[in-house]
Amino acid sequence: MEKKDIVSYNYDELQDEIKSIGEKPFRAKQIYAWLHEKLAEEFDEMTNLSKALREKLDQAYEIRKVKVVAHQISKVDPTEKFLFELEDGNRIESVLMKYNYGNSVCISSQVGCRMGCRFCASTLDGLERNLTTSEMLRQIYQIQKMTGERVSNVVVMGTGEPLDNYDNFVKFIHMLSDEHGLNISQRSITASTCGIVPNIHRLAGEGLQITLALSLHGSSQEKRKKLMPIANKYELSEVLEACDDYYKQTGRRVTFEYSLVAGVNDGPDDVKELTGILKHRNCHLNLIPVNPIKERDFKKPDSKKAMEFQNKLEKNGINVTIRRERGSDIDGACGQLRRRYGAVIEERPDEDICED
């Protein structure tokens, strides 16, 4: 019989499981603390449990491992990148970024991605599978254990589309912010989506307080379609309406992410179109000079051109910043480290969700 993934149980579910094996409910609190506060990787670490109970747990459950196979430390800024191997041999990436206000971790939500964004390394091999809730959590846990640094902020902007792994992602948010676990404030969690419209509306009604970051990347429907196959399924107007719904239901300002690609979406017309889209919305625009990858032809504009683009938008009343580049010397972009360490090289066509 396959062992159950005990780390993916939330607090209430774990209480039910512990009752089902004939143990008292208070044991669930002890076990949950070992898993989600003390970050235990083996049942034998749980020293306030009897040996008999530890053996009983080991027979029915497992703490699925997330093994570090590569660890890069930037020499130019306080950024570290991790390549993790999962129990089935698949590999995922995470990044630790240290700031004055605390430590932020960027995690993956899928093995690969089927969204097919033209400038993104993580889509090149297509989607292998969704990550479980425990695999998302354990990226953070492993980084805390390895570095001894407490994580205060989490961004779900690594490999994968979190709203394409909806149920596991939402459960992850609840468990990450649970008072019985790491208890990270939902307001310190940001999730990026390329714009799966029905799931943005669904997320708006979940009662969460996370920040939604919408991958815009094109100032019009036609430009988005050239960069993001998902735009063949959802019109820009639909995506913006969904973002408005998220703001209306949660009170949380939406961030719009915009990868600046030289000669593609960084011209005067783009400034005008972005102004029209964003000026009357309570939002923030984050400009991201694109990370060049060898499999794609895209180049980022020089810093002067990027600053000019930002300044023109600011003059038009747009709340806009340029994202500071982090980890430029350590395969900092999503998917680069995974491919370097032997992921499948065959490039796959865009999958069903991106088709007309």
Protein language model regions, located:
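Auxiliary Fe-S-binding modules of radical SAM enzymes
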Residues: M1-I92, D244-R253, Y258-D356
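Glutamine-centric residue-chemistry signal
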Residues: Q30, Q110, M136-Q139, Q310
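Generic beta-strand structural signal
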Residues: E80, I92, N103-I107, M115, ...
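P-loop NTP-binding catalytic core
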Residues: D88-G102
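Canonical Radical SAM [4Fe-4S] cluster-binding loop centered on the CxxxCxxC motif
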Residues: K98-E135
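Conserved alpha-helical substructure of the radical SAM core
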Residues: T123-N153
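Conserved AdoMet/S-adenosylmethionine-binding subsite of the radical SAM
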Residues: Q144-N153, G158-N316, V320-R323
